[in-house]
Regions:
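Conserved protein kinase catalytic/activation segment
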Residues: 1-3
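Conserved catalytic-core motifs of eukaryotic protein kinase domains, centered on the activation segment
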Residues: 12-16
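Activation loop
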Residues: 17-27
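C-terminal lobe helix-coil module of Hanks-type protein kinase domains
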Residues: 27-122
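Regulatory extensions appended to serine/threonine kinase catalytic cores
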Residues: 122-141
Length: 141
């Protein structure tokens, strides 16, 4: 996947224009971008980072946050990809995609710490090829 939607990042606040027009991409925009714009902060970007990570694994974006507020149909990363990726990564994605901004990491530093933390649950699961190789080695030798 390639990140291409930086149009919103180019928009700046000038003295002549004191109000920013809402700009967001459904699926990647945090709930506060739809409604409570006074609550924007680092946690808003963290939601978008979580959505981007989710989209990398899923091949498409998660459901739009405004739809999730009405009827949350998001299948958590932990449920969807357990055994395929580290629990640490999946938990971090789910943490970033919390609808309540107070439940998300509150800074990029805290998100970085979560991503760099040692995985205490053990090693990452084997890939399909690694599992097949181990199984064949056990059976053949």
């Amino acid at each position: 996947p390639v990140l291409i939607d930086f149009g919103a990042a180019r928009q700046t606040l000038t003295q002549e224009e004191m109000r920013l027009q809402p700009m967001y991409t459904p699926g990647f925009a945090a709930p506060e971008q739809y409604h409570n714009r006074e609550r924007l902060g680092p946690w808003t970007d963290i939601y978008s980072i979580g959505a981007t990570l989710y989209a990398c694994l899923a091949g498409g974006p998660p459901p739009a946050a405004d739809a999730r507020l009405e009827n949350d149909k998001l299948v958590s990363a932990r449920v969807r990809w357990t055994g395929d990726y580290s629990e640490q990564l999946l938990e971090t994605i789910d943490h970033c995609l919390k609808l309540n901004y107070l439940e998300r990491p509150q800074s990029l530093f805290s998100l970085q710490k979560a991503l760099l933390a040692k995985n205490v649950s053990g090693p990452a699961p084997l890939s399909v090829l690694q599992s097949l190789k181990q199984k064949l080695n056990r059976e053949l030798f």
